[in-house]
Amino acid sequence: MSIVEWNEETKKEIQDMINEGITSFKLYMTYPAMIVDDEDLYKIIKSLNEKGCFAGVHCENAGVIDALIQEAKAQGKLGPENHPLVRPDTMEAEAVHRLLVIAKEAGAPVMVVHLTNRKAYEEIIRARENGQTVICRRPVLSILLLERQRLIPNLISKVAKY
């Protein structure tokens, strides 16, 4: 279940879901309709932990990525081959780092979902070395696609024809 806002009604709905057996919830640090800000991220992660639950978080620096997308559009770079160009590794790593600092302050374990690069994974390694409980999911297929795309220009647009 995704949590996209933090208010009294959401808190009640989450408790109802917990009563039905749901123990993990997904949060987003990106996507305008789903993003939770840092304050709510902290409050949600802390509250879930206090209830014996945890959060899986999709980590990206939404502000910079949105700016990069606008720049790419202005340059006519609209194809799927430009996807990794507007989502540099550093923007995921920054968001993972920020999440881990927030989770540490909340005293809560956390899961990073859709991890896509080494820089972001290094943030997780550091947090684990410092005693934090961090789980991560790295979707192999998307990683292979992104790595191949970087090695073979226009791979996605060529493959998409078939």
Residue map of PLM features:
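Histidine/acidic residue-rich metal-binding segments in metalloenzymes
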Residues: E9-Y28, A33-Y162
